[in-house]
Structure formats: structure tokens, C-alpha cells
Amino acid sequence: NNHVIEGMTEIKVVLSDRREFTAKVLLTDPQTDLAVLRIAAGEPLPYLEFANSDAAEVGDIVLAIGNPFGVGQTVTNGIISALARTAVSISDYQFFIQTDAAINPGNSGGALIDTDGKLLGVNTAIYSRSGGSNGIGFAIPSRLVQQ
């Protein structure tokens, strides 16, 4: 996410096998809170295919992947609670996927995937008074990520 890398002079990407790479910023968009990074891994890396976020429905099961509080790669599950959520005030973009899958600080930029293992969205924010997950998390739909 843009809010994660904004103002950074050096960005490191750590893969699940603990390999670290310096990342190059290809694109940032504060309006949608998206950022695109590139690493030179020297070999093809696994990747997720895009899901059709326009076909998602309230009640669909989803998995949120991230690094909450820096503890390491974590997967949580939940459902899509709402679509096209507009009163989020996270960025200028107004059509977030809302989920009750636990999303905490450190999950930003992580994948929200569907039960087919496809990228449905990019985790970006939570509503929380405590700073932890209250079951109200938001992801940027894959439709926008693909643009």
C-alpha cells in the first residue's frame, strides 16, 4: 500500500522463505492507496491470479494474509461483510470490500484471497478504537488493482 511505503528511502521485501530483496517502486497512487514494487529475484516467483472482484458476494469466504504486528506470515479467515463500502474515509477511492477476517496493523498490502486461491483484494485498513482487529477490515478490490 502507498501508506506503508510513503516517505521511505529504502524498501525491503521478505519472502516466506526469509529471502530478502531491495524493492524498486514502480508506481504509487495515494488516491487508491496502492503501490507497485519490483524485486530482482533472479528466478520466477509464485504469484496469485486475479479473482473477479465484481463477481464477489456478501457472505463469500475469504482469507486475509499478512504480517500482523511483525510476527510473521499469518492467515486469517472470514467472510465478505459488505461490498462497495463508501463511507470509509481511507482514501479518495470509495468502493472497498469489507471483511470480518482479522486484519491488524502489518496486514496492509497483504492479499485478500477467495476460496479458489485467487487475489480478490489488497488489505488496506481497519476500523478500530484499540488498534487491533474488531472484525471491520477493508481491502481494495482486485478490479482496481488490475487497472
Residue ranges and their predicted role:
Residues 1-147:
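Serine-dependent protease modules
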